[in-house]
Swiss-Prot record:
Domain notes: The cytoplasmic region is required for subcellular sorting on the cell surface. The C-type lectin domain mediates the recognition and binding of oxLDL.
Cytoplasmic side: 1-37
Species name: Sus scrofa (Pig)
Record's GO cellular component terms: extracellular region; membrane raft; plasma membrane; receptor complex
The protein's name: Oxidized low-density lipoprotein receptor 1
Role this protein plays: Receptor that mediates the recognition, internalization and degradation of oxidatively modified low density lipoprotein (oxLDL) by vascular endothelial cells. OxLDL is a marker of atherosclerosis that induces vascular endothelial cell activation and dysfunction, resulting in pro-inflammatory responses, pro-oxidative conditions and apoptosis.
Coiled-coil stretches: 89-142
Keywords: Cell adhesion, Cell membrane, Coiled coil, Disulfide bond, Glycoprotein, Immunity, Inflammatory response, Lectin, Lipoprotein, Membrane, Palmitate, Receptor, Secreted, Signal-anchor, Transmembrane, Transmembrane helix
Glycosylation sites: N139
GO BP: immune system process; inflammatory response; leukocyte cell-cell adhesion; lipoprotein metabolic process; positive regulation of superoxide anion generation; vasoconstriction
PTM entry text: N-glycosylated.
Membrane-spanning parts: 38-60
Membrane disposition: Lipid-anchor; Single-pass type II membrane protein
Length: 274
């Protein structure tokens, strides 16, 4: 056996390292090939989850923005509603005040109307009374004749003239009267007021009589000293007589022959006045 044969045999007896190496690497290659699809799927799933998370974050951001906008709108609406409520409360308060003022005004007007109604009724009653008085006056001829003045129980007429005392007395008699007689201070005041604006003297029914030289009225009654005091020739007896006249409220004694106006007097017809 030669050396070449020994080398050839020894080379045949050595294991094939390449073959063994290939055999060792074979299982690992198969394992790697098996995990690659799973890793790919897992990566895809992670990518999908990442995309989903990103989308969710975007949607949440959008929802958050939308919620913020809605909150702003709601806040604005609340402000508007609060303003409207405040305006409504103010309007109600103003309406209540206006209603109260209107009620007070109505009550005041009603009170005034009631007073006016009472006043109107009083005026109507006064008008009715006046109409009755006018009707009564229309049927009333009066206690004194026409052109005579009525005072208490007597009628007075300021006659034309002037005439002497005697002529004046006759004129009064023709009128169914007598010359003026003063019975009281009230009568004197009435005559004084009536002739206050006259500058003429007026004969009275008072004269100085004999035998006692007393001042007597035409009906024979004496002069009452407290009524008035005679001025002038109160104690002088003239041939034609001494008579009294009134001038500007003062009574004078003078000659009966002198001319003056006169005041006639007679009783008033009080029964006819009733």
């Amino acid at each position: 056996m030669t050396l070449d044969d020994l080398k050839s045999n020894s080379m045949k007896d050595q294991p094939d390292e390449k073959s063994n190496g290939d055999k060792a690497e074979g299982p690992r290659s198969l394992s790697t090939l098996r995990w690659r699809p799973a890793a790919l799927i897992l990566g895809l799933l992670c990518l999908g989850l990442l995309v989903t998370v990103i989308l969710l974050i975007i949607q949440l951001s959008q929802v958050s923005d939308l919620l913020k906008q809605q909150k702003v709108k709601l806040t604005h609406q609340e402000d508007i509603l609060e303003g409207q409520a405040l305006a409504q409360r103010q309007a109600e308060k103003s309406s209540q005040e206006s209603q109260r003022e209107l009620t007070e005004m109505i009550e005041t007007l009603a009170h005034k109307l009631d007073e006016k109604s009472k006043k109107l009724m009083e005026l109507q009653q006064q008008n009715l009374n006046l109409q009755k008085a006018l009707e009564k006056a229309a049927n009333f001829s009066g206690p004194c004749p026409q052109d005579w003045l009525w005072h208490e129980e007597n009628c007075y007429k300021f006659s034309s003239g002037p005439f002497s005392w005697e002529k004046s007395r006759e004129n009064c008699l023709s009128l169914d009267a007598q010359l003026l007689k003063i019975n009281s201070t009230d009568d004197l005041e009435f005559i004084q007021q009536t002739i206050a604006h006259s500058s003429f003297p007026f004969w009275m029914g008072l004269s100085l009589r004999k035998p006692n030289n007393s001042w007597l009225w035409e009906d024979g009654t004496p002069l009452m000293p407290h009524l008035f005091r005679l001025q002038g020739a109160a104690s002088q007896m003239y041939p034609s007589g001494t008579c009294a006249y009134i001038h500007r409220g003062i009574v004078f004694a003078e000659n009966c022959i002198l001319n003056a106006f006169s005041i006639c007097q007679k009783r008033a017809n009080l029964l006819r006045a009733q």
